[in-house]
Amino acid sequence: MSRLKRIAGQDPRAGFKAAGRDCGTSVPQGLLKAARKSGQLNLSGRNLSEVPQCVWRINVDIPEEANQNLSFGATERWWEQTDLTKLIISNNKLQSLTDDLRLLPALTVLDIHDNQLTSLPSAMRELENLQKLNVSHNKLKIFPEEITNLRNLKCLYLQHNELTCISEGFEQLSNLEDLDLSNNRLTTVPASFSSLSSLVRLNLSSNQLKSLPAEINRMKRLKHLDCNSNLLETIPPELAGMESLELLYLRRNKLRFLPEFPSCSLLKELHVGENQIEMLEAEHLKHLNSILVLDLRDNKLKSVPDEIILLQSLERLDLSNNDISSLPYSLGNLHLKFLALEGNPLRTIRREIINKGTQEVLKYLRSKIKDDGPSQSESAAETAMTLPSESRVNIHAIITLKILDYSDKQATLIPDEVFNAVKSNIITSINFSKNQLCEIPKRMVELKEMVSDVNLSFNKLSFISLELCMLQKLTFLDLRNNFLNSLPEEMESLVRLQTINLSFNRFKMLPEVLYRIFTLETILISNNQVGSVDPQKMKMMENLTTLDLQNNDLLQIPPELGNCVNLRTLLLDGNPFRVPRAAILIKGTAAILEYLRDRIPT
């Protein structure tokens, strides 16, 4: 009832009357009524050029429903209203906000992104309860000092403005956990920035920064630092002491040397692609014990040291577009799920092997790890077995590499002799690619307790039989270049599957069963006819990091796909949708996801 106290002599209905007149049709009374109950009001995308007075005064004036019912015994007690705590007025045409903002002191969330604001009202500093403020995609040129008084602020989004500097006093935001200043015109970061001791995520990408302050290492809780697309030539050595850092993005800068990270024992992802790095040495690698993703693409590397084997947790390694002519064979002993080598003058690995993908490259490198003895080709020739069918089974591959290889035979069936050759040997991989198979060999089920990798690409498969669904240790499955348009629901039993390649088939939608294989990390389904994806189901796939949807029939990309924050590689080129535009796609996955998130209706 405290909200209903009025200044002496004031007409108790006057405020309401003004509110109703000011709102017109831009803000329906039903929406205001619901907001008084829920404490949340969403006015996004209403073409507003100013905020109606009835919004600012929502908890001050007597509502319209008071006209219909003044009884204290009424079912709907209009006087028992909830203070507005969340206000969303994004995607409008607002050029300014008035100081009437102070009439909403209970606000904890204020979203005013995607407007035309050039400043913030001084009353902003009075919103002492505010925890989340989104002012992104506006026209702010000067850092709003009003923000520095918001001591309870935890999330601040100022990306896509025209800021050139950060004002003093910013360090007073001691509770800030998430700060996005990307896509501005910042040239420096003040040393006082380091006082943001609670900061967990900091995005400084797409600015004009030439350096980072040494004091950055005082941010003891920082886990995610994004400095992509700046002008950085060096990284302060103090950054190596950030013990909590897990994700570091330094792509598209001017770095010539890879920093060392002696204290960053928790670092999981290091992205330094598109720089000018010329050398990768053991000192750069030996402390990266937890690294999962290492992006070195588009640099000037000439070699990869043998010490790469120290990165035992590494899952994704991108070396594309460098000057690398050879790879250490020890690389084959890493448990990589993705290895990119395109655009290098490699002379020690045939292009045919590289085109077969990561697992084939690793197997090839492992086969070369020998201190003595004959070469692989000589050994294979000596141990190959001639079968009655005149087929040749590589016994060396079975015994040494644990591969059952009957590829590139143009066979319509896999002879029994091939499976018989396994005998008591342990087999972890099957390669029946480049044949004329119309169905999956039934005898594959005999290897269900062993096999983790299966390559059935470049065949004539139009359906998947249940035999494949019984390979419960399967982690890698290559089915590209077949005639598939669906997958059986029974594939849900493949509870260890991490990578599936369905490119160059006939799928018109992402198979439903894939959404239920929560171990999946990589889905490659380019060059099909996929017309839609379900972002809600995909968000549940928390391990999914790579999704290739290139060259399909996607007419639109659902904004909710931006919530799939675990995606590190999202490929969408070659689809007929108009948004996101090509200019967004070329910026990479992080930019695409951010673009999509900013357009989620709220």
Swiss-Prot record:
The keyword tRNA processing does not apply. The modification Phosphoserine is found at S71. Residues 1-20 are annotated as: Disordered. Keywords: Leucine-rich repeat, Phosphoprotein, Repeat. It comes from the Eukaryota. The keyword Cell division does not apply. InterPro entries: Leu-rich_rpt, Leu-rich_rpt_typical-subtyp, LRR_dom_sf, LRR_domain-containing. It holds the Pfam family LRR_8. GO terms for cellular component: cytoplasm. LRR repeats lie at residues 83-104, 106-127, 129-150, 152-173, 175-196, 198-219, 221-242, 244-265, 266-286, 290-311, 313-335, 336-356, 400-421, 426-447, 450-471, 473-494, 496-517, 519-540, 543-564, 566-586. PANTHER family: PTHR48051, RAS SUPPRESSOR PROTEIN 1. This is Leucine-rich repeat-containing protein 40. It comes from Macaca fascicularis (Crab-eating macaque).
